[in-house]
Amino acid sequence: MTDLRLFTSESVTEGHPDKICDQISDSILDALLTQDPSSRAAVETLVTTGLVHVAGEVTTSGYVDIPQIVRDRIRDIGYDSSEVGFDGSNCGVTVSIGAQSPDIAQGVDRSYESRSGSASTDAHDLQGAGDQGLMFGYASRDTPVFMPLPIYLAHRLAERLAAVRHSGELSYLRPDGKTQVTIGYEGLVPRTVDTVVLSTQHGPQVSQEDLRREVEEHVIRPVLAAAAEIGIELDSRDATLLINPTGKFEIGGPKGDAGLTGRKIIVDTYGGFSRHGGGAFSGKDPSKVDRSAAYAMRWVAKNAVAAGLADRLEVQVAYAIGKAAPVGLYVEAFGTAHVPEDRIVRAIRETFDLRPAAIVERLDLLRPIYAETAAYGHFGRELPDFTWEALDRVADLQSAAGL
């Protein structure tokens, strides 16, 4: 097979320093929403050797024990002793949390439409967007869950790497790790696994030869086999497998690298297959359209591709701070549209209410569901709480598009 185009995406495990921070921020958000569903939060976390610092803005009627949440999450990930380089029980935890700016709150609590007298009687007109910005959603027919194949496989490898560590199947593994998958495409069709890169932290008791053999046997091959079982047909016979290509990886986690919330936005979304508006997700309550509108755009794109409007679809929405109605909606079908793109835009407008309050209500986002999103991808996992993955607007879109 010749003339394949190679596309690569990466993922990281829950023990990667940046992902530790995302999970801490979202665990704090979940605790706040459990006590007060109307909580406003923007929680940022930094981890480094022996220290966690939590900062940001929170407005809530509840109370949460942030240091305890931090320690519990770190231990759950697997950093529970100095032997692995970080210990949730003994690390330092500092907290600097203030209230949300009243200048921001005024635009969310009372929208531009409400203040200017142009609001309708619809309650969804009363809440403005929490910031200006642009958000993208994407879907394709690469996989049964309508995700690009490279990021889908990278996430499954990272999940499997964590699973065999937690189960004790590969007891020498430690929490930090990264995966990367390069897929060969013939036109728009994925054909081959070209390269898999997997780097995993480990204890000193295992040789690199044994680690590479066992990671291939217990992680890589099972993931590729599982993909085949759900109809993803790929030729991996000539795939290059690079497992810990630098050699030993004993120093990892916050001892090896500092971590920050929001530094894995491409891992969190589509692995580079789609554009990104720049806003991170974790630690933000759903009044922040960086998060809620990105979830809505995934919902839109997935339903539109499932409805047969296009085989690949990227959608963009844009907001002005304090304004309820979006200021822009754009679609790109990359030459795969089955109806004109202007008709796709009209069908989306007819089918989806993209005002922030409507998104929050339709997707039921004022719930403590966010820690689960913070590792292995916000999209493409059809879990019960991931309402943005539901294919519940397919018939409506087909009708609106005249299919």
Swiss-Prot record:
Cell compartments where the protein resides: Cytoplasm
UniProt pathway annotation: Amino-acid biosynthesis; S-adenosyl-L-methionine biosynthesis; S-adenosyl-L-methionine from L-methionine: step 1/1
Protein name per the record: S-adenosylmethionine synthase
Origin species: Clavibacter sepedonicus
Residues that, per the record, bind L-methionine: 57, 100, 257, 288
Superkingdom classification of source: Bacteria
Required co-factors: Mg(2+); K(+)
Purpose of the protein: Catalyzes the formation of S-adenosylmethionine (AdoMet) from methionine and ATP. The overall synthetic reaction is composed of two sequential steps, AdoMet formation and the subsequent tripolyphosphate hydrolysis which occurs prior to release of AdoMet from the enzyme.
Quaternary state and interactors: Homotetramer; dimer of dimers.
Top-level EC class as recorded in UniProt: transferase
Gene: metK
Reaction catalysed by this enzyme: L-methionine + ATP + H2O = S-adenosyl-L-methionine + phosphate + diphosphate
Binding residue positions for K(+): 44
Region (Disordered): 106-126
